[in-house]
Amino acid sequence: MMKPINSLTNVSSWSGFDEMSRLLSFAVLFTFSLTGRAQTDSTMVRNDSVTWNKSLEGVTVTAQRQLIRQDIDRIGYDVQGDEDSKTENVLDMLRKVPMVTIDGEDNILVKGNSNYKIYKNGHLDPSLSKNAREILKAMPASAVKRIEVITDPGAREDAEGVNAILNIVMMDTKKMAGVTGSLTGSYNSLRYPSLGAYLATQLGKAILSVDYGYNYMSKKATTTNGHVERTFVSTGNTEVVDSRGTNPGYVHYVDVNASYDIDTLNLLSASFGGYFYKVDVQGGSDVTMCDRGGNPLYHYADDYWMPDYYHHSWNGRLDYEHKTHRKDEKFTLSYMLALTRQHTEQETNYVDALDIPFNYTGFLLNSREHFTEHTFQADYVRPLWEGHKFEIGTKYIFRQNSSDNAQHFYDAASTTTSDLFDHTTQIAAAYADYIYHKGKWVARAGLRYEYSHMKGHYPDGKTADFGKHLSDWVPQASVKYQVDDRQSLKLAYTTSITRPGITYLNPAVYSYPASVQFGNAHLESAREQSILFTYMYVGQRLTLQLVPQFHFYHNALGSIVYAEGDTRYSTYGNVLKQHRFQMEGYVQWKPFNATTFVANITFTDNHANHNAAQLKQHLTSMYYYAYLSQKLPWKLTATAYTYGEVGHSPMNIYAYGRPWMRYAFMLQRSFLSDDRLTVRLMANAPFHKNLHYKTCTTQGDIIGWGDNINTQNNQFFRLSVSYRFGKLKASVKKTETTIENSDVVGGISKGK
């Protein structure tokens, strides 16, 4: 259980400046004398408390409830302690959570990236992980007790490639009267409607909650243009591509959770959810190849469309938890089923052709991919004696991937190519975690072992089958020291592994006029090791976190791009050696009662070596996010935020992204009793219509630059309305441990 940071009674809104002064003093002296400074700060806090108590006569005191709590492996934000939880949804509250950022399109990043999973009440919620922004937008913040960022997952999850876990802890009171929930709807100037509903009810010992949503993406909202120039080093020829595209369509999602209290010691919980989307993809491009002197060698235009493109993913989970009469001792059994199906049918025609280097006028591509996963897991937690706890568990995963790809070319011979590929993975794992807590010290150490067997099979017999056995030991350890009531220090060592998915493994060859791409069936799992040091200060008005860290790996999965003549070839390999230094910073400051400022900053210094291409890369970048909220008269709340990146962020060993910036403004007001009705107006980039994302390719067989332009969907105005009904007194209970799989890259996309 997380220990709350002690709070001090606040006399004046100007105490935030006092905290800033004390913090700056600490930062200067910290380098010279950590221990001495810790004792001085503790004394100063006690003296301040005494001074304030003596001067309180005749003064009205406004107490500030401490909203941020910390433990050895996580940081928690007290949603119920935030007055805004009465009128906002969970997605809004995430903007205030340390190390979490929300962009203008409501995409969620944790610790500056999308490599995370989302838990609900301590266990994985697959539907929530895949449709987070839609579900959390429909869920009222009043239904949530706190939000946790698990920064250092223990041995139970750590091997499976997740940088962080976002845990949504629901309200857990025992009784509920009737039905409670919320209805949400929004519409923006890009003709993009969105609807959502969250319902919860109790039937005897059973509690049920349902999330449902629908989004329609218009043609205007999905229009993009691009310009790319590629120079082939060996020939000196340059390819110029101007592209256009749009993908209007719709998506439905649902997430159902249920729990049943068998008795005070036994709990059964289940969930079912998923999403389905279908889009009408259309687009085209104009391609010109020029020689060194700029003279055209050939030219063509293409038009493509996908009359049948759909993707659906479904999952189910069942957990049984048994608690003993010993405090905090429990045993959990879990099963999870995940299904993903994807079908792509793309037709492409070439027109306005001049001296083209291929003999067909178009092609029809038909692709089907299936993914099925069964997971079984058992977990046991045993407190040994005061301050000591032991956790053990085991896990088995069986994955089946299959793909069927056929490509028919419109040429004189009506050539057809076909590739069938099946891939299975079996994983057996066991872990042990030990936690020690005494006084100001907390320590944690764990070890995980994973054995995996991968097998590739080609039903058409065109390629020989293959198999591979992998064994991985994954240690982790961390230690935390609470300097005083406000400050703490932590040192952590973590490792993780990542396995290739079917897209990376599938050797099927996809041929286009100027490019060829294929997978690599002989890829291995990759291992990353990290060392992190964390300093955290939690005060009444000011919260600060600094996390310098070092990451390194020697066989990471990476792209292999090369050229033969004027044709671009791409595949994958265990070819990257990388060393990365990062400095993560978070600050939350309340200089006045009605003002909140939040900032997340991540500085990255990245060194990479590509073994296959004998290339090196050194890039630095900084991602930033700043959020300012101001309460105004008449129940109005004004919010502004900006986010972006400066420097050069690596895309791969060959290319990097250029700086970019986004911003938005919001105005909100609540109506009716208990602020049940909330209306919000948002302006996203009102002064910039086009959204540019520029890239540069500076080494390898092909160099050049690109500019991807969202011509419409950067600038929009959105009106949102939400209505809460019923009185929330309970939420679906969940077992505190369950299944989470996140070790695959390059598979069928599961979304975020």
Task: Report residues per predicted region.
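Outer membrane beta-barrel strand-and-loop segments of large Gram-negative receptors
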Residues: 364, 373-377, 419, 427, ...
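Short acidic/polar hinge/loop motifs at secondary-structure boundaries
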Residues: 90, 96, 123-151
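Surface-exposed extracellular loop regions of Gram-negative outer-membrane beta-barrel proteins
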Residues: 167-183, 222, 226, 240, 453-456, 481, 485-530, 550-566, ...
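Short, acidic, small-residue-rich periplasmic hinge/interaction motif at the N-terminus
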Residues: 40-83, 103-105, 111-115, 150-152
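N-terminal periplasmic accessory domains that precede
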Residues: 58, 90-93, 132-134, 149, ...
